[in-house]
Amino acid sequence: MSNKEEKTQERRKKNPIINVLKTEWEFLGSRRKLFLFYMFLFFIAGTAGLMTTLVIGWIFNSIQQTMTSDSELRKLIFMIFLLLAIKIIFWMFHGTARILESLTGFHVHKNYTNNKMYKILELPVKWHKDNHSGDTIDKVNRGRGAVENFSSYYTFELMYLLLNIFGSLIILFFVDLKIGIFALTFSSFILVGVMTVDKKLRKYYLQLNKFSNKLSASIFDYLSNIITVITLRLRKTVSKEIDSRLIVSYDTYKKETIINEFKWAFGSIAITLMTVLVLIYQAYTNYHATGIILIGTLYILYGYLRTVGDAFFEFGRFYGKLVKLNARIEGAYSIDDAFEKVRGRVNGKLPYNWKEIEIKNMNFTYDEEWKRNHLENLNMKFRRGQKIALVGESGSGKSTVLAIMRGLYPPQGGEIYCDGEKVRNGFMKLKQHITLIPQDPEIFNNTIKYNITMDLPTRKDDLNKFIEMAQFKKVVARLEKGLDTNVLEKGVSLSGGEKQRLALVRGLLAAKNSDIVLLDEPTSSVDSLNEMKIHENIFRNFKNKTVISSIHRLHLLNKFDYIYLFDRGKIIAEGTLAELRKNYRFKYLMKKYGLRKEVE
């Protein structure tokens, strides 16, 4: 187990309050000093707020004991005005701090969300296949919601709860040492009892989160395949499945609800008992000592006892909320754990001015039991700006090589050499320079423009340039709304080739800043004439980029500088088109695709 994984395990064992605070601190980033500043403002505001009960007690005692002259009346009026001053001071500091807290919470939420998305996008395809998208979405949404709620709304509550408890106890110690000790001891027992129950509830919250993750995964499946559900008349089946996934959490939810209500009943009764006992004690001792029971002193005791009791009780409620939030944050730890396994291989790039890259002894299998190698001891070399073609029959390994180069799958063996020098974590660094444009177009239910730009800022010149490169300009021109046309709008019907060209525009735009562009038959459904023009456009506009293309139609080969011939996961021949024309396996492949004249 790595040090990072051990830290993750330690976080799971920590008190929820500490863990949630550490999570906020981690994602505060450059705003940590600002966090300390507004927490100090909350401290001043909370301290000022505590003075209200004390001042009211003084007012009552003043009226009861010494209200016999104008000077004493003026003193009374001054103390009454103190209540207004306290409120003004409170809002001066509290209001400022709340604004800073809310704005900081926004940035904490942003940092957390970006962190999780970065990690998810860096994880290999195998992880994504093993972890349902709906489950992952639910974990991220719950985690970011928990972090946002705590950092925007809960930190000031925590500060005031601690101030109300310890500030009130300090004042009670000054009023009567015995009462202060009793209140501290009694309240501590209440808090321990409530937190013990919450520790048990934490287990139920984690279970309920898991049930929710699975439910979200099912809902995601059914809604993302709604056409299949409707056409196969699966509405009742789907409803039953959703209901069964809901009902499976009922027993846990029932236990959590009953225990939770018992906890609140216990806390409320215990706090009231503490207050009653202290007030009886104070009234009894004052009466027998002086014959006078001061209303103000009783009010001060009652006010601060109630504040302490309410604060402990509220702390129990607050702790329960934090246990829920912490459980949601912990739910996303599986993403962190998976990322830690690849962290060391993620960062870093090849030299900016690299000239030649060589792949040596690359091995790969989809079979975890290693019964079959899908790629075996593959060796490839390419220069910056070179145009490479990968040819071979279906299943020969062309697409697999491209997927590994882009980092979709980790190879089981192999090294990367850059300008003759071996590169540590070479495949992870190589993928940072690559854009892969796949064969199957993924079209979103949105406008043509959205499908191209993914709603990212894009210069109009770039947009038009790549539309022309992909031979998609005529398609856009025939649509009444042009780029603003929704692909699923009534009357809009894109053919398979047009959908491929739409996806190709998006891929070429994304490849603008990449050194290496991989084409995995992205024009397989495009007619031969447009396919030829597309490749000519790509090679003309991407002169300084390396283009490696898996192609099915071999009439394009005269456009490439170098060719690799694949068969059953191995490279069986390589060279220029002129050189490969002498190879009998290559001749056979050309004849098979009806290009007999090309090899004669």
Label each region the model flagged:
Residues 1-49, 67-79, 97-101, 118, ...:
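Membrane-integrated ABC transporters
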Residues 2-4, 536, 544, 553, ...:
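C-terminal portion of ABC ATPase nucleotide-binding domains
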Residues 26-33, 125-126, 142-151, 155, ...:
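An intracellular "coupling" helix at the cytosolic face of ABC transporter transmembrane type-1 domains
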Residues 35-93, 173-178, 288-295:
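Transmembrane helix-loop-helix hairpins at lipid-water interfaces of multipass membrane proteins
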Residues 66-67, 72, 171-185, 259-329:
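Helix-loop-helix
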Residues 99-118, 132, 159-160, 183-227, ...:
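Cytoplasmic coupling helices
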Residues 305-369, 410-412, 417, 459-468, ...:
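ABC transporter TMD-NBD coupling linker
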Residues 351, 402-468, 532-533, 537-544:
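Conserved post-Walker A segment of ABC ATPase nucleotide-binding domains
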